[in-house]
Regions:
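Catalytic active-site module of serine/aspartate enzymes centered on a nucleophile-bearing elbow/loop
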Residues: 228-255
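Conserved alpha/beta-hydrolase "acid-adjacent" motif
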Residues: 203-209
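Gly/Ala-rich beta-loop-alpha elbow adjacent to hydrolase catalytic centers
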Residues: 99-103, 107
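Short, surface-exposed "cap/lid" segments of acyl-processing enzymes
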Residues: 4-65
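Short beta-strand/loop motif that positions the catalytic acidic residue
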Residues: 190, 196-198, 202
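Catalytic nucleophile-loop/oxyanion-hole region of alpha/beta-hydrolase
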Residues: 65-91, 96
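Catalytic histidine neighborhood in serine/cysteine hydrolases
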Residues: 211, 215-233
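Active-site nucleophile loop of the alpha/beta-hydrolase fold
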Residues: 122-132
Length: 255
């Protein structure tokens, strides 16, 4: 996996205006850690073809060099999503957030502070915690080790890539660990409707992430759909159509 060779424009911020009766409904799609906007572009194109206004931002530290992810503070991830949310709300009557992996934790953190602006949250294999004893010492480890092997491109469908980094930046992981702990504490505050997709064969995240979110989130309107034929980056995998269509119905019913 590497960002070289990505389709032109797929590693940049992407925005498209809506059309027809859905033109005033916006969808903000947030990619995962070490991933890129490319992992959300087909999803965004599908929704835009249905008339929805879409925004797929580059989360700071991504879509450039993996070393850049060792230089950012977690707050910049939240700020980027918040900025895009506020911009969408200027022209949209309803706004929904879609988060993949860490993009899920990122979306939840921001949504907790902006429930007046968010009408629904769609999560695809979301990350809300990192289990294991070693992660507690990641800040110390990051002082002597800059990176580890990549955890990206966990995709069952052959020949598909998310155009992310080919290394796992350790200082970036330390920031991610801090961020997810804060995001988890906010879960009980979130009353927004939630649709969560979970791959039963996910090699990147433990199922406890899904269980924690569904158990601890404050929303009474929450749905879970299991994906039987996809790995972690399910938005690019065999079950993508299931995600796209069910997300469309979720948005349609609430707008």
């Amino acid at each position: 996996m590497a960002i070289e060779g990505a389709p032109q424009g797929w590693l940049s911020d992407y925005r498209a205006k809506g059309s027809g009766s859905n033109a005033d409904v916006g969808v903000l799609l947030v990619h995962g850690f070490t991933g890129s906007p490319a992992s959300m572009r087909p999803f965004a194109h599908f929704l835009n073809e249905k008339g929805y206004q879409v925004s797929v931002p580059v989360i700071p530290g991504h879509a450039s060099r993996w070393q850049d992810l060792n230089k950012v503070h977690w707050s910049s991830w939240a700020q980027k999503v918040e900025q895009e949310l506020v911009e969408l709300k200027k022209t949209c009557r309803k706004v929904f957030i879609v988060g993949l992996s860490m993009g899920g934790g990122n979306s939840l953190y921001v949504a907790a502070d902006h429930q007046d602006k968010v009408d629904g949250i769609i999560l695809v294999n979301p990350m809300i915690h990192i289990p294991g004893l070693q992660i507690k010492f990641v800040s110390i480890i990051s002082k002597v080790q800059k990176s580890r092997a990549s955890v990206g491109d966990d995709i069952k469908k052959p020949g598909v890539t998310e155009w992310g980094y080919d290394a796992l930046p350790i200082k970036g992981v330390a920031q991610l660990y801090k961020y997810l702990k804060l995001a988890r504490k906010r879960l009980p505050r979130i009353k927004t409707p939630v649709l969560l997709f979970h791959s039963v064969d996910d090699h990147t995240l433990d199922v406890s992430n899904t269980e924690i979110i569904l158990d601890e989130i404050g929303s009474s309107d929450k749905q879970r759909i299991e994906l039987l034929n996809s790995y972690h980056v399910a938005t690019l995998d065999y079950d993508a159509d299931i995600i796209f269509e069910n997300a469309r119905l979720f948005i349609q019913e609430r707008s």
